């Protein structure tokens, strides 16, 4: 399971800046759930082959309602969710009484904690860091989150005890397809798991949130190995029973990150709600293959079914690559068809394609519809090669690639999806500007070449063509 890191500290010490710095890597996922987390923001980030989840909390001052009540809120939950705590302090302000109160609470929770002295630019580190050693929490790490200084060395220290994840293990090839069942509470996730397994392996109650933690279940179907990951559902903040569902968002993000295929279960009777869309976005940004299951479909009348289908067509255009199934997990209607989409999505996400094949597709696409002209010059796309899988990444080389407009990127995505017959997985197309290897050679001439060129120009002037 990937580690969870909470950023804790007083207001305005740079927690959000550090959060943005950590989650701005190429594969970062930033998930700010409106109305769900309020003062907590969740993001997935990566340092080389180490993935981790970051939680940004609201500031703790301890001056208005007291540190105890403040810590009992969002930051306390973040600390409970976390494996590691980054305690952010302000180097310019120095040690503050609120810092000492926060440190006292962190010691009570006995979590692995790193003191991070932010805003160190322009200061003598020895003088600036000295007061924070009085907290008695070990080494103090100097950083300037705004410019990224010291952040990489900090994270290398923090993640040193967490081994890198080999590519093969990330893809789950040894254990078969890993399927994450995600969705809001009480949409029927555990019922669907039991239906897929053919037995009551997961306790099911009517009360939302009875699946407290993610459950990993290994099984085989027709001699093929699978792992089902059942998660606690995501629910609006005001409805969360803290004793039951305080870990739901982190567990859902961890399950998505750990899965090969995500089945998003939605309640057909409620239609499409904002949290469903956020979960779809989370899966897509994580690059996971996606299957959508609308549960409780058999309980709808025809007019309601017609309305829901129209809503799906209108609001889910951004996931038009995902297969949609109308099911009843309770009665088993349509559940068996999910496996075909799971297999298809996994195959599409993990297929390998040759450079020659990808380049031919690119050339055909360019012949059919050329890129636009920028500043009087046509964008040239020369060749393509694979850049990874799960999800498929295609690297396109050419000139002026920074100017390729979004609509042309969409055109290339659709072309590759159609020709490669990819279903259920997002595609990522990245561009590289290729330098002309002969350009420097054209610009520079030897002395002898220069003399010969001048003589030729002089002859041409003296002997003009008639």
From Swiss-Prot:
Positions with a binding annotation for GTP 1: 9-16, 56-60, 118-121
GO molecular function: GTP binding; ribosome binding
SUPFAM superfamilies membership: P-loop containing nucleoside triphosphate hydrolases
Cysteines paired by S-S bonds: none
Disordered as annotated region, ranges: 442-466
Domain of life: Bacteria
Residue ranges of domain EngA-type G in the record: 3-166, 177-350
GO biological process: ribosome biogenesis
Record's keyword terms, sorted: GTP-binding, Nucleotide-binding, Repeat, Ribosome biogenesis
Pfam family for this entry, one: KH_dom-like
Annotated residues for binding of GTP 2: 183-190, 230-234, 295-298
Record field: compositional bias (Basic and acidic residues): 455-466
Ranges of residues in domain KH-like: 351-435
Record's subunit section: Associates with the 50S ribosomal subunit.
Function of the protein: GTPase that plays an essential role in the late steps of ribosome biogenesis.
Family: Belongs to the TRAFAC class TrmE-Era-EngA-EngB-Septin-like GTPase superfamily. EngA (Der) GTPase family.
Protein name: GTPase Der
Species for this entry: Cellvibrio japonicus (strain Ueda107) (Pseudomonas fluorescens subsp. cellulosa)
Gene that produces this protein: der
